[in-house]
A protein has these predicted regions:
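Short beta-strand to alpha-helix junction loop
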Residues: 105-124, 248-256
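FAD/FMN-dependent oxidoreductases across multiple families
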Residues: 101, 141, 253-326, 333-334, ...
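Core beta-strand elements of the Rossmann-like FAD/NAD(P) dinucleotide-binding domain
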Residues: 15-19, 158-168, 293-296
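Predominantly flavin-linked oxidoreductase catalytic cores and closely associated redox partners
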Residues: 26, 127-268
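Beta1/beta-strand and adjacent pyrophosphate-binding region of the FAD-binding site
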Residues: 10-29, 45
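N-terminal FAD cofactor-binding segment of flavoenzymes
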Residues: 42, 50-96
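Active-site-proximal substrate-binding core of FAD-dependent oxidoreductases
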Residues: 324-377
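Glycine-rich FAD pyrophosphate-binding loop
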Residues: 22-26, 35-58
Length: 469
């Protein structure tokens, strides 16, 4: 089957310059956005910088929380061939400093995926819905009217300049997107408070071993030698492991390849292991964008900070963000206007679904840049981690008195850190409550943002961390 047949591109489409919608990036968010728009009968093209053979090959930890549900535009059944390990059901947190391992239950459905296979399946799903793909196409600039409305992009394909005009542009180009560098977004609510230091630098290898690992039912985490970083070992199968590590870019740079190699060499289960694939990436371990809309323009997935800032997980959030953005884009096209007011509902749905929770979790990412890693690991090893994890996953802000007393008894010697964590959780809860009152229109945005910034000052004061934003 040819590439054009595989993605439904007719020869005439390669020279076409006018579309209802242009989506930049064939990742999870971009493909779900395009599939949703195409399902509604609109002409949509996905511009992808990679070749047809490389598209979908993305650096990822491969772990997926929330594997039980995906938006209808690309159903879970189409993605399931990429789910290589659905037997994972808990986290395993290794603390070498304390010679301790915490087995932490994780509610909900987990899976580890083959990310390249998953990427191809998502692309197939968007193509099946009617989206057109233009591969080997790199965006160079964003087209805007005098009033700032985005009307398309300029790109280059194999040395040939291309113009794409559209009613709506969806930015699914990933972390530190070039579209946001090129577009003038100053006169809208679109979040431009974005710097590299809010991101995590990560690297992963796909490693094969001869004997099954003992922890094939777990997602394994291990702290790096400095704060604000961790190693992971996520089993695709009993003998195929996604091994990687990352660190927050506020910290002194790590030698990612060498540090991972050192840890692999010190683990008996990886003796004689063979490396199949290597990739690195920047991950937006930050709060979601305050607003990801601008007239004629919406950002989705990594391009809008739709990632859990404590784990780096972003597949499920990207799928829903792409869907929500597309549904709002469809409404805007039906109304004949792509103003911020019409697109705003997309922001609300993101915050309601996962954005508020991610913003609160970002408080703990901020704390990790200021806390002494050995002190924190000592506390975690002393605390009844399994029970505390279960209580926190349940969504309860209050632990039972029995658990509180047990925790305090086991945390002797770490009371300063316990108090810091307690106060930090109060700040996170306050922030969560504020995000749950996200404004229903741009009119209330400035007031909401000012109060959020005030709450963040309290976060920095409590944690002792340098300002992240």
């Amino acid at each position: 089957m040819s590439t054009q047949e595989a993605v439904g591109v007719g020869a005439g489409d390669l020279g076409r310059d006018s579309w209802d919608a242009v989506v930049v990036g064939a990742g999870t968010a971009g493909c779900y956005a395009a599939a949703t728009i195409a399902d509604a009968g609109y002409d949509v093209v996905i511009i992808e910088r990679k070749s047809p053979e490389e598209a979908g090959h993305i650096a990822c930890g491969d772990a997926l929380k929330g594997a039980d549900t995906f938006p209808d535009a690309i159903p879970k059944s189409q993605l399931e061939p990429a789910f290589t390990n659905t037997g994972v059901d808990h986290g395993r947190f290794e603390i070498p400093q304390e010679d301790t391992v915490l087995e932490i239950p994780v509610p909900g459905e987990l899976a580890v995926v083959d990310r390249w296979t998953y990427g191809r399946k998502v692309i197939e799903g968007a193509a099946d819905a009617g989206a057109t793909f233009h591969y080997d196409t790199v965006v160079q600039d964003v087209r805007q009217t005098d009033d700032g409305t985005v009307t398309g992009v300029d790109a280059i394909r194999k040395g040939t300049p291309r113009t794409y005009d559209a009613e709506i542009v969806v930015d699914g180009a990933g972390a530190l997107s070039i579209l946001q560098d090129k577009a003038d977004l100053a006169d809208s609510t679109f979040d431009t408070n974005v710097t590299y230091s809010q991101f995590c630098s990560a690297y992963r290898e796909i490693v094969h071993v001869d004997e099954p690992v003992e922890w094939s039912d777990a997602l394994v985490f291990k702290p790096t030698e400095r704060a604000a970083g961790y190693l992971w070992y996520f089993p695709r199968t009993e003998t195929e492991i996604n091994a990687g590590l990352g660190f927050q870019m506020t910290e002194e740079p790590m030698h990612l390849v060498d540090d991972l190699k050192r840890d692999l060499r010190n683990r008996a289960e990886f003796q004689g292991a063979r490396v199949e694939d290597k990739l690195g990436a920047a991950i937006p371990t930050r709060r979601p964008y305050d607003s990801a809309v601008h007239p004629g323009f919406v950002a989705v997935g990594d391009a809008a900070g739709h990632v859990n800032p404590t784990t780096g997980g972003g597949i499920a959030g990207a799928a829903y963000a792409g869907t929500y953005a597309a549904e709002q884009a469809i409404e805007a096209m039906e109304q004949g206007t792509v103003d911020e007011d019409v697109l705003w509902r997309y922001n609300e749905r993101v915050m309601d679904h996962f954005g508020a929770r991610y913003a609160a979790l970002d408080v703990y990412n901020i704390l990790s840049t200021a806390v002494d890693i050995d002190e924190l690991m000592g506390l975690l090893a002393a605390m009844p981690g399994e029970q505390i994890a279960e209580a926190l996953y349940s969504g309860s802000a209050n632990l039972g008195w029995g658990l509180k007393i047990k925790a305090l008894l086991k945390a002797r010697g770490h009371y300063g850190t316990v108090w810091n964590l307690y106060k930090t959780k109060q700040r996170a809860d306050e922030l969560l409550s504020h995000y749950e009152d996200y404004p229903s229109s741009p009119a209330g945005f400035d007031t909401w943002q000012a109060e959020r910034d005030r709450l963040m000052e309290s976060v920095y004061e409590t944690t002792g961390a340098d300002p992240k934003y």
